[in-house]
């Protein structure tokens, strides 16, 4: 029997979303945990599935906050890495009146795209029923190469 139902690799970041206006009429922003792969895991965890996350955050206070939120949700964080040089990725989210959203990412680079192949524990892939990854991991070379490395058929068997 496999240890996990789903393991996800990808971005874990802060989504800043508008939460009202200040007394001066300026937009007030709220910091929320974000990143599609972890969002998927959080919902699966609520459905009683065993989940684990593989990714990277900054060693800053935001990265530590995210690690705590993910762990508190019951998601295994043994493969969550911290980058001491690159900050946690930020996304500013604008929601339109029709509910559509627009994202502005602040990562050049961001910690989530700095997960290298040598930081990925291949054994966890063999111990899961399903491996999920986010598309943003494919947009930057370091994280793309890590994903390609871990996704090779010999590692997924």
Language model features by range: what are they?
Residues 148-157:
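Single conserved hydrophobic/aromatic residue that forms the stacking wall/gate
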Residues 145:
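Glycine/Thr-rich phosphate-binding loops that ligate phosphate moieties of nucleotide
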Residues 1-76, 115:
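Glycine-rich phosphate/adenosyl-contacting loop at the front of the ribokinase-like
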Residues 50-135, 140:
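Conserved N-terminal subdomain of the carbohydrate kinase-like
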Residues 44, 139-141, 150:
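Low-complexity, intrinsically disordered/propeptide-like segments
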Residues 3-5, 89, 102, 153:
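A residue-level signal for beta-strand positions that form part of recognition/binding surfaces
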